[in-house]
């Protein structure tokens, strides 16, 4: 039995076009309040992005659901997340697939996310402190790659780490950003523009 706050959010997401019941179930199962600072706990189930420190944010639940839905995951999907952040998106993915790989450039965020995931008994996640622009070559190829910060252009390393028929979902742009869904067909990449978005930038090279 879900609470009224959770049910209200799920209804909002359905109204906004989220139809994948597995994604909605994962949203309901992951306690978002565990991924935000105490000062923002009362807003945890609102459909809004919230700050998590280090100039980063926990994405709006709609955007988490939308991007996850666009990945068209199966339990067997090999998934790479770029930008672990709070670990919230990671937790959603961990409820949907057997294993998740996640890269975070800010060490303190990586450790906090690992602690939260462990507290929730989500042990099917591998995290790495590294440059998201480079992906995770040692674990490639991936069926699905999701990027939770916006590069000015699509990182070529991520395209290279997509398996055939794999999907990359990411925001792209600087001042004006658009959510893109890219599917690999052999050596070709089919790019669809989904909607206008606003994300923090995907910082290149610089680890913190």
UniProtKB/Swiss-Prot annotation:
Domain of life: Bacteria
Cellular compartment(s): Cytoplasm
CC annotations in GO: cytoplasm
Keyword ATP-binding: no
EC top class named in words: transferase
Active site: 59
Tagged with keyword S-adenosyl-L-methionine: yes
Name recorded for this polypeptide: Protein-L-isoaspartate O-methyltransferase
Organism: Klebsiella pneumoniae subsp. pneumoniae (strain ATCC 700721 / MGH 78578)
